[in-house]
Amino acid sequence: MGDRNLTPKQFGALGEQYAAAWLEEHGWTTLSRNWHTRYGELDIVMLNPEYTVVFVEVKSRRSMHYGYPQEAITPAKQHNLRKAACDWLLDRRNRVPHTAVRFDVVTIVLRVGRPLVHHIENAF
C-alpha cells in the first residue's frame, strides 16, 4: 500500500479498487468501471441502496503534501464528467432502474497501514 514503485496509472487503479471495495462494503453495487467516452473516463458508476446511480470520481494520493485530493477536480473536469455521465445514461446497455443521479468524490490517501478514505456525497 502506498508503494513508491507503482506508476501513476497503477497507483490510481489501486485507489479505485479501494474506493469500489469500500462502497461495496456499504451496500453499493458496481455498475461500470473505467467507462470511456469522448469526454473522458468515468472512474466508477455505482448504484447505492436508495437506487441512486452515483458517478464516483476517485482521487488518490500518497500524502496531503500538495493539498486535498478533491482540489484536482476542476470546473472543466466536472463539466466533462457530466457530459460523460449523460453518455453513460443514454447507452442502452446501462439501463438500470434508479430514482436519482448524483456525483460523488471518494478520496484515498494510501499510506502505510490502512488507506484513509473520505466520501464526499453530492460533490458537484
Swiss-Prot record:
For this UniProt entry, the molecular function terms from Gene Ontology, in alphabetical order, are: nucleic acid binding
SUPFAM superfamilies noted in UniProt: Restriction endonuclease-like
Q: Which family does it belong to?
A: Belongs to the UPF0102 family.
User: Per its UniProt record, what HAMAP family does this chain match?
Assistant: UPF0102
The name on file for this protein is UPF0102 protein Blon_1698/BLIJ_1758
Origin organism is Bifidobacterium longum subsp. infantis (strain ATCC 15697 / DSM 20088 / JCM 1222 / NCTC 11817 / S12)
